[in-house]
Amino acid sequence: MGNRKLSKRQKERIQSIQERRRERANLKNSIGDKALEDLADLGSETTGTVVTNYGAQVDIEGDREPFVGTIVRCFKRANIDSLITGDRVVWRPAEPQGVVVAREPRQTELIRPDNYGKLRPVAANIDRIAIVFAAQPSPQSNLLDRYLVAAEAQGIEPFLILNKTDLLDHQSYPQVDKLLQNYQFIGYKIIRVSVKSSEGIDQLQTYLSQNNSIFVGQSGVGKSSLINQLQPENNSPVGPLSAATNEGTHTTTASKLIHLNGGGVLIDSPGIREFALTHLSQESIINGFKDFRPYLGNCKFRDCQHDREMGCALLDAVAENKVLADRLKNYRQIIQSQSHK
């Protein structure tokens, strides 16, 4: 039988059924109050951090003796909302597995869509978002701006890592160098690194040493190789670029929290090809372009769309080289893509 095109209502019904199935599967693997009685040697409450999330179960790293630095696989109680890497939790040790009994409020969270388009948090309590890009695959300012807007909207400090600087040649260098100059003009921190030559690795280690950070970026930009250079014992699998698409193959399947030897915490996240902003309002998106902020509210018309209107403060700023034309173009593209969601 040939493939049949599904209507929007049919797709929504299928998605709803699949969502309920996933929820039932998670519920079967969570643990209720009665089941707690079946666990032997149920210990006192202690605190820890979610290192990796496997859905119904999580790995917790204890931060109190005798569990400091120890990774314990835990169920979660049925009344606890979803847990994600970086969550601070209260848990109780038990045999054969521990039990998470509470989750502390999140200071920040990073959100991305799942395979069904539903927004899911993927990491919690992070201070900085490291947006990794490279000469291959070719960096796109529109994608970088999506990451930056998402970070700004969450109140998380973003910075840029140009990886694989050893791959820059006379053809790719001008484009990438221009991109770097643009973001430096805006005021973003940029660190240039190469795993092959070790360029910038010490600078990056120092910058990461005092914070909880997360690496995000397209597949194939070298996040896993870079993490292995920062933390050799981590041994994240490395995927090559696909010859057919010149894009990377996905190698990381679940977000993982790593303690860096030089200090600081790093979360290694799955490759994100496009960063969803569907949960953000138009006001949040435009405020996510921090170089626009001095001009917002100064347009002649209150409903200015910053397109062709007379008296648009942003258009005037572009004409005066105070705002980059590419940034305004990317903003318009993001808003246009939002209208089609």
What are these regions (language model features)?
Residues 2-14, 44, 72, 81-87, ...:
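Helix-rich effector regions associated with P-loop NTPase G domains
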